[in-house]
Curated annotation (Swiss-Prot):
TM segment ranges: none
Gene: folD
SUPFAM superfamilies: Aminoacid dehydrogenase-like, N-terminal domain, NAD(P)-binding Rossmann-fold domains
Oligomeric form and interacting partners: Homodimer.
GO molecular-function terms, A-Z: methenyltetrahydrofolate cyclohydrolase activity; methylenetetrahydrofolate dehydrogenase (NADP+) activity
HAMAP family: THF_DHG_CYH
Biochemical pathway: One-carbon metabolism; tetrahydrofolate interconversion
Protein name in UniProt: Bifunctional protein FolD
GO cellular component: cytosol
Family the entry assigns: Belongs to the tetrahydrofolate dehydrogenase/cyclohydrolase family.
InterPro entries reported in the protein's UniProt record: Aminoacid_DH-like_N_sf, NAD(P)-bd_dom_sf, THF_DH/CycHdrlase, THF_DH/CycHdrlase_cat_dom, THF_DH/CycHdrlase_CS, THF_DH/CycHdrlase_NAD-bd_dom
Entry's Gene Ontology BP terms: L-histidine biosynthetic process; methionine biosynthetic process; purine nucleotide biosynthetic process; tetrahydrofolate interconversion
Length: 283
């Protein structure tokens, strides 16, 4: 049995459904969803991510608008640009590509996006909805992608012991809320957690999202664990690896996602799913 989860194939299923839905919406309304992407500066990794998002959006019929702004832009000027996008009736969703330069107040920027267009799910109102168990807002795309992969391979999550290694607002915290809603027992670990392997080795599900290349070796997992690797780390020049020592772990566990080709494609699929949802709400 092949236990390596093909995130690209799962994402393509979602994108195929979305393509049909976008066409139906276009036939019905005469309009297409539109995703505005704000990119500040010229971080090479960010440019690659943005190009990827635009490519997949256009492939399924979602229009895109890229605002590439200078690294010198001030917080208040960036907020003004976002306010224009909030008012633009042709724009369904808005994302700001992270990370932002240190000179910009990230929290002010994310809070400036209209919650109804916040398809990344980072606005405080949407965060509040998620952690209150209210289904009104948008949920961060990587967390949604992780949950979808987990549920595809373990449909009944009730009572499962899930460990998330990483407490970011992008993955760790939102995914903990989603797994709690599925009645998992959830533990969040982080850089200050002690005896990490003794915690993770008891878990049914382990999500690694710490940004530390190949950190979690086979001793961190029990044999029937589901391992979701969210890490994207560049080593030795151009090689991309996850937070899990994939080659030595894959033969031990029940299921594992690779890097690349695991959660990355799912993140884009759910970003575009959120964008279509925003369009439907608005129209």
């Amino acid at each position: 049995m092949n236990n390596v989860i093909d995130g690209k194939a799962l994402a393509n299923e979602i994108l195929s459904e979305l393509k049909h839905e976008v066409q139906r919406l276009k036939d019905k309304t005469g309009e297409s969803p539109k995703l505005a992407i704000v990119l500040v500066g010229d971080n090479p990794a960010s440019i690659i991510y943005v190009k990827n998002k635009i490519k997949h959006a256009n492939k399924i019929g979602i229009d895109t608008l890229l605002l590439n702004l200078p690294i010198t832009i001030k917080t208040e000027d960036l907020i003004a640009k976002i306010s224009e996008l909030n008012l633009d009736q042709n724009v369904s969703g808005i994302i700001v590509q992270l990370p932002l330069p240190n000179s910009i107040d990230k929290n002010k920027i994310l809070s400036a996006i209209s919650p109804s267009k916040d398809v990344d799910g980072f606005h405080p109102l949407n965060v509040g909805y998620l952690h209150s168990g209210i289904d009104n807002g948008f949920v961060p795309c990587t967390a949604l992608g992780c949950l979808e992969v987990i549920k595809k391979h373990e449909p009944n999550l009730s009572g499962k012991n899930a460990i998330i290694v990483g407490r970011s607002n992008i993955v760790g915290k939102p995914l903990s809320a989603l797994l709690l809603k599925e009645n998992c027992s959830v533990t969040i670990c982080h850089s200050k957690s002690q005896n990490l392997s003794s915690i993770t080795s008891k878990a049914d599900i382990v999500v690694a999202a710490i940004g530390s290349p190949l950190k979690l070796t086979s001793g961190y997992f029990k044999p029937d664990a589901i391992v979701i690797d969210v890490g994207i780390n560049r080593i030795g020049g151009n090689k991309i690896v996850g937070d899990v020592d994939f080659e030595n772990v894959k033969s031990k566990v029940k299921y594992i996602t690779p890097v690349p080709g695991g959660i990355g494609p799912m993140t884009i699929a759910f970003l575009l799913k959120n964008t279509v949802q925003a369009f439907k709400i608005y129209s």
